[in-house]
């Protein structure tokens, strides 16, 4: 069972583990969607699915992580906002 802690002085509950997105990207550079390997995207989706299953609802990414944001978009879109 995932443990959660209050985030700073807010009422938000954050999991003690987060899913860091630095290595989710296909490349460090911006790429066309068609360049992302299907197997790599399936692996990313399975990773996020399992993380959410385990109660990890903090998934971070950054503009500097290449194609990470583009690849996470379709995966995160399938979850309700209150799940992540």
How would you label these PLM feature ranges?
Residues 1-84:
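N-terminal binding-site loop/beta-alpha segment at the start of enzyme catalytic domains
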